[in-house]
From Swiss-Prot:
This is Large ribosomal subunit protein bL33c. NCBIfam families: PRK00504.1 (NF001764), PRK00595.1 (NF001860), rpmG_bact (TIGR01023). Keywords: Chloroplast, Plastid, Ribonucleoprotein, Ribosomal protein. It holds the Pfam family Ribosomal_L33. It is found in: Plastid, Chloroplast. Coiled coil: none annotated. The keyword Ribonucleoprotein applies. Belongs to the bacterial ribosomal protein bL33 family. InterPro entries: Ribosomal_bL33 (IPR001705), Ribosomal_bL33_CS (IPR018264), Ribosomal_bL33_sf (IPR038584), Ribosomal_zn-bd (IPR011332). GO terms for biological process: translation. HAMAP family: Ribosomal_bL33 (MF_00294).
């Protein structure tokens, strides 16, 4: 018997402005790791988080 998959999974959130914007404070892309409940939030998450590269709060989207 195999072990059942957990309901909570680890996800990565990436800044949407760092990908397209070249005028930023430093090079790189801001990424956060967090957990989400697969049953309550089956779609991809978008959260407003602080980006140290853009030096402001931006929308971070879930990536694979």
């Amino acid at each position: 018997m195999g072990k059942a998959k957990g309901i909570r999974i680890l996800i990565t959130l990436e800044c949407t402005e760092c990908r397209s914007n070249t005028n930023k404070r430093s090079n790189g892309v801001s990424r956060y790791t967090t957990q989400k409940n697969r049953r309550n939030n089956p779609e991809r998450i978008e959260l407003k988080k602080y980006c140290p590269h853009c030096n402001k709060s931006t929308i971070h989207k879930e990536i694979k």
